[in-house]
Every structure is written in C-alpha cells, then in structure tokens.
Amino acid sequence: MQLGLNYRSDNVIKYVGKFGGVTAGGYWSFGNGVAGAGEVAGQFRRDTGYGASLSYSGGPFGATVVYDQYNPTLSATTGATGAFRKVALAASYETGPVKVMGGYRWGLNKGTTDATLLRDNYYWIGANYQATAALGLTLAYYYDDIRNVAGFNVKNPWQVTFIADYAFSKRTDVYLTTAYSKNSGLNFDTSAISFANAYYLGAGADNMIGVAVGVRHRF
C-alpha cells in the first residue's frame, strides 16, 4: 500500500538464529534514504532502520511476531527525520491438504513535528489447498483499516487474490494469478510518507483487476 523509495534498506547487518522450532532475527540499517544523504556525521539517527522477529513452527502450527522501524529524512534542507513503525502478528495451521493463515499489522507513521502522517490496521487471511499432487490453489483477502491519514479518515482499500499453480515436474510449473482491488482515493506517497512522488485516482477509478499467466522453470 505504501510506496516510495524510502522502504529499501541498504547497508544492513542482519542476524538469524534457529533454536529448535524457534527462529529469532534482527537487523540494523546504518543509513539510507532519498531526501537525505545516508550516514551523516553527528546525526546517528538519520535514515537508520531496525527491526526484530520471532517465529515458531511446530507440527501443524506456526506463528510469527515482527517489529520494524525506519527513521527517514523528510527534509533535505534541515535533515529532520520521521519515524515509521510497524508491528505484525501472524499465524498458520495446516491439516491434510489445507493450510489456513492470517495476520494483523499495526502501523504508525510520524512526521518531523511528531504529527501523525498515517495510522492504520492491516489484516489478511488466506488458505492454500493442495488439490492434487500437481495442482495447488491459493485464495487470500487483504483489508486496510485506515484510521488517520494527515488528519483525514479515507475509504479503506481491500483486495482479493486467487492463484492456481500446476507442476509439470519438480522444476517446471505453470501458474494463473488474479486479483481484484478496491482502491482508496488517497495520494499515499505525499500524505502517508511525505515523499515527493504523487498519484491520485481518476474519477470513478476506484477498483482494478489484474490477471497473469506464466510458465516457470527453475535452473
């Protein structure tokens, strides 16, 4: 949902440790950004990013909790930074040929003056069904409850996705993917992350559908 170049983290140190059914991870980005120049002497916080995750997988059940924060430069003139925070929880359960999964992500973007740029609750639920040894089906639903965007309460976007994948062999498969989206009439880049790249919906252009078919071969 959120666009812009600020979401790519370079210059990263990452750790992943596995302890039985538990996997722990963490990362630190030393400095990257669009408006800023990355690492700046005497400005340790500028364009930094960090996060941590903890997941468990045991038998048919799996669960994950994740925290992520990025402190992008929002003013190239003053070097002032914002704070974009995300916390996510997700779980899955598998029984026979069916695997169901769902999750929740809390989000809060703060600007240079600590004003709220974006506050939202993002939900998703889906299922994988292995119909045959070769045919796999996936259905998923995504919903973003946008509570506040720069002082406005806008319509909530959502999307339904369906994927069918048929394997000819261990290395070659063909797939069909479709999605229907109900869009929100919002310029996310400017309003939600203070980025210069902007887009607006045209009149009546509040939904879209996409279909793709392809063949994949693994080398």
Model-inferred region functions:
Residues 162, 168, 203-219:
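Outer-membrane beta-barrel "beta-signal"
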Residues 45, 50-167, 177-181:
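Detector for outer-membrane/organellar transmembrane beta-barrel domains
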Residues 38, 77, 114, 151, ...:
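Outer-membrane beta-barrel and related beta-rich outer-membrane complex signature
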Residues 21, 134, 170-171, 205:
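Short loop/turn motifs that connect adjacent beta-strands in outer-membrane beta-barrel proteins
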Residues 185-189, 198-206, 217:
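Primarily extracellular Gram-negative trimeric autotransporter adhesin
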